[in-house]
Every structure is written in structure tokens, then in C-alpha cells.
Design a protein with these regions (language model features):
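Beta-strand signatures of extracellular beta-sandwich domains
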Residues: 58-62
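N-terminal signal peptide c-region/cleavage motif recognized by signal peptidases
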Residues: 15-17
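Short coil/turn motif common to extracellular beta-sandwich-like domains
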Residues: 38-47
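Short, compositionally biased P/S/T/A/G/V-rich stretches that sit at domain boundaries
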Residues: 22-39
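Short acidic/polar inter-strand loop motif in beta-rich domains
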Residues: 96-103
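Surface-exposed, short loops/turns at beta-strand junctions within beta-sandwich domains
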Residues: 80-89
Length: 113
């Protein structure tokens, strides 16, 4: 019985430690801020931090629903081409190795003037 309890405790500890070490996926667009006014004549930069989690591999960057870049760095920046005047939606989505979004993303709205 003691061996059974010891085995159970060892298995439980191993399962817990694996669970504790697995980070949840997350995306943070650090800049620009939501609602920021960007220069429509400039190449603006977006900075980000990503934790891909156990199901993610890298991220894709979208402007107004169109994929514009595949980003392999988990912390970095992306310089956008000039944006036409008006509202724009910027999104970063975590994707798997097959480039399929896993449902973890952040989107912000900006205004180019």
C-alpha cells in the first residue's frame, strides 16, 4: 500500500509540474495604442510580445483582415507600409506550424491621418 501511495504521489507531482510549466498563449500589442493616430505618409512600427503556448508556433500580422507578415520572433516589431487615411484594424494572431490560427489574438484600431 505504501508503494501505491508513493507511486500516486510521484505521478501527481509530475503531472502538476508539467501543467505548471506550460504557459498559456497570449498576445500583447505594445504599440501603437488602441485609438492611436498614425501618420498616413510614414511607415509606422508595431511592437509586440507573444507567448505561443503549447499549441502555437509563430504569429501572423494582419491589417484590415489581410495577412501582411509572418513573424517568427516572439518579441519584436513590424514596420508597416504606409496606411491610407482612415480607420484601420491591426491584428496579431498566434498560429500553429500549419499556419492555422489557434484562436489567440489581439486586435487594435488605429486612425491614419
Amino acid at each position: 500500500m505504501k508503494k501505491l501511495i508513493s507511486l500516486f504521489a510521484l505521478l501527481a507531482a509530475g503531472s502538476f509540474s508539467s501543467w505548471a510549466w506550460a504557459e498559456e498563449a497570449s498576445v500583447k500589442i505594445l504599440s501603437p495604442a488602441t485609438g492611436a493616430k498614425l501618420d498616413s505618409m510614414a511607415q509606422n512600427k508595431a511592437t509586440y510580445e507573444v507567448v505561443p503556448g503549447p499549441r502555437g508556433d509563430h504569429v501572423h500580422f494582419y491589417i484590415d483582415g489581410q495577412e501582411v507578415a509572418v513573424l517568427r520572433q516572439l518579441k519584436g516589431s513590424y514596420t508597416m507600409e504606409t496606411l491610407g487615411p482612415g480607420k484601420h484594424e491591426l491584428c496579431i494572431k498566434v498560429v500553429n506550424k500549419g499556419h492555422t490560427p489557434i484562436g489567440v489574438q489581439q486586435c487594435i484600431n488605429v486612425i491614419a491621418e
